[in-house]
Amino acid sequence: MDRERYDKVIEACSLSKDLEILSFGDQTVIGERGINLSGGQKQRIHIARALYQDADIYLFDDPFSAVDAHTGSHLFKEALRGLLCSKSVIYVTHQVEFLPSADLTLVMKDGRISQAGKYNDILISGTDFRELIGAHQESLAVVGSADASSVSENSALDEENGVVRDDIGFDGKQESQDLKNDKLDSGEPQRQFVQEEERAKGSVALDVYWKYITLAYGGALVPFILLGQILFQLLQIGSNYWMAWATPISEDVQAPVKLSTLMVVYVALAFGSSLCILVRATLLVTAGYKTATELFHKMHHCIFRSPMSFKIAKTCSKTCIYSS
């Protein structure tokens, strides 16, 4: 692993504090759905994985949609304009405040490229694009004024209740610090939800085969299956021996039995072997179907009665693989 690039990517994607919060840092298993992560954290992790690949061409499809404005500005500055300054980046976005930094701007309308060129050139030549930029700036101004008014109201309340807020803040910090110290002093290792599977190596034990054999009807069909197989083999050997003994070697040698007797006995042996193989196959299919049904029902019963920790630790993909 390139540790230097790894640290740069973590810093550019604002993941340092997130890794500190996680119990096992960057070794925390988050599962197939990104458990314990918010939408913004997932998005920044995806961006970090792409940045670490150190490719020549990057394609971003509105990557800052799940993050706030401040984080989006940081990602654009540190990631796209920082780490990827020497790369070819195709950036698709609705956030027009990032367009002045682009080398080439393509304006899409109804699925087609309506304008192409530098940001300032398009802004001067295109009325639609100018209206879009103006509407975006007006919306930013409205949001900024609303934020400023809320901040002023909060500051006024802080001045009126400053002592009370300071006391509450001090107590809250002290309590959180005490809880943190208690967790550190307890010394109990935290457990990950998704754990690595344990696999047994070696040959399959005999009791496993015995449980499988006796699962269908308590193993009552097994003797009949073996008997059918044994009778089939005996009849096959008998029919071959009968044909070798009853068939004359040449025309000069007299046959030990009549031709009709030879055919009747051979047909009887063939019919008996066919009947045995039919019975064996029927019993084998019945036992196999019953065993598979019992295993499936037991598996469903265990899954439905399992605690929530099992459903978190075992992902849906693994459960489906085991079920198949």
UniProtKB/Swiss-Prot annotation:
Keywords on record: ATP-binding, Membrane, Nucleotide-binding, Transmembrane, Transmembrane helix, Transport
Domain ABC transporter: 2-111
Subcellular location(s) of the protein: Membrane
GO cellular component: membrane
Entries under InterPro entries matching the protein: ABC1_TM_dom (IPR011527), ABC1_TM_sf (IPR036640), ABC_transporter-like_ATP-bd (IPR003439), ABC_transporter_C-like (IPR050173), P-loop_NTPase (IPR027417)
Sample GO molecular function, one term: ATP binding
Annotated TM spans: 212-232, 259-279
Pfam families: ABC_tran (PF00005)
Cited PROSITE patterns: ABC_TM1F
Topology in membrane: Multi-pass membrane protein
Domain annotation ABC transmembrane type-1: ranges: 222-324
Domain of life: Eukaryota
Family: Belongs to the ABC transporter superfamily.
Protein name per its UniProtKB record: Probable non-intrinsic ABC protein 5
Protein source organism: Arabidopsis thaliana
Gene: NAP5
